Regions:
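A short, well-structured alpha-helix characteristic of acyl/acetyltransferase catalytic modules
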Residues: 1-50, 174-180
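Terminal substrate-recognition subdomain of acyl/acetyltransferases
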Residues: 2-3, 154, 159-180
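Acetyl-CoA-dependent GNAT
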Residues: 41-101, 171-175
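Conserved G/P- and acidic residue-centered "switch" motifs that form tight phosphate/ATP-binding loops
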Residues: 72, 104, 134, 160
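Conserved acetyl-CoA-binding loop-helix of GNAT-fold acetyltransferases
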Residues: 102-116, 135-143
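Conserved GNAT acetyl-CoA-binding A-motif
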Residues: 119-129
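Conserved catalytic-core motifs of GNAT/GCN5-like acyltransferases
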Residues: 127-130, 147-163
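Conserved active-site tyrosine of GNAT-family acetyltransferases
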Residues: 141, 146, 168
Length: 180
């Protein structure tokens, strides 16, 4: 799954490589990141290596990194999962380095990948899940055109309370209607 060009004006976007693993592990293990994920377990180097081998050889999952063009700093990781070429849909997600949040990078990465998935890969539907407490992400997803499709009520225990897991989806026709 080759990407068009190599990113955006501010970001180099490419497949995750072994040289990225330590920074990506630190991002995953950061408390602010874990609060937003469905999986709350810290990852060791050994666990990450096994995971990397699996995702590197997968036909249905990919991981990409976004790095700032000016200094090669890691901005975030974009997840593509459950890629179903027969039904033309996939699940996506992103983790942004805490110091890089609220600077428009998540929107930039999502817009880049949505263009790619709908225009180049011919996907019909892109979906994601997020926690109700992740209000910034929910606002971004709605801004991008994602629609809430359902909830798993009180499915996730975070920060001392149960909260819903929100399923959102975006269809190609909805994306094209927004972007022309």
């Amino acid at each position: 799954m080759a990407l068009p060009a190599n990113g955006t004006e501010r970001l180099v976007i490419r497949l995750l490589e072994r040289r990225d693993l330590e920074e990506v592990r630190c991002l995953h293990n950061h408390d602010e990141t874990l609060l937003r994920l469905t999986d709350v377990w810290h990852v060791s180097e050994t666990q990450q290596e096994a995971w990397f081998q699996g995702v590197s050889s997968s036909h249905t999952s990919r991981r990409y990194v976004g790095r700032r063009r000016t200094d090669d700093a890691l901005v975030g990781v974009f997840r593509l999962d459950r890629l179903d070429s027969w039904n033309r849909n996939a699940y996506v997600g992103a983790d942004v380095v805490p110091a890089m949040r609220r600077q428009g990078y998540a929107e930039e990465m999502f817009a880049y990948f949505l263009r790619y998935l709908f225009n180049e890969c011919g996907l019909h539907r892109v979906a994601l899940v997020t926690l109700t407490s992740n209000t910034a992400a929910l606002a971004l997803y709605r801004k991008l055109g994602f629609v809430e499709e359902g909830r798993e009520r009180q499915a996730i225990f975070r920060d001392g309370r149960f909260q819903d897991l929100v399923l959102m989806g975006l269809l190609a026709e909805e994306w094209h209607g927004r972007t022309g």
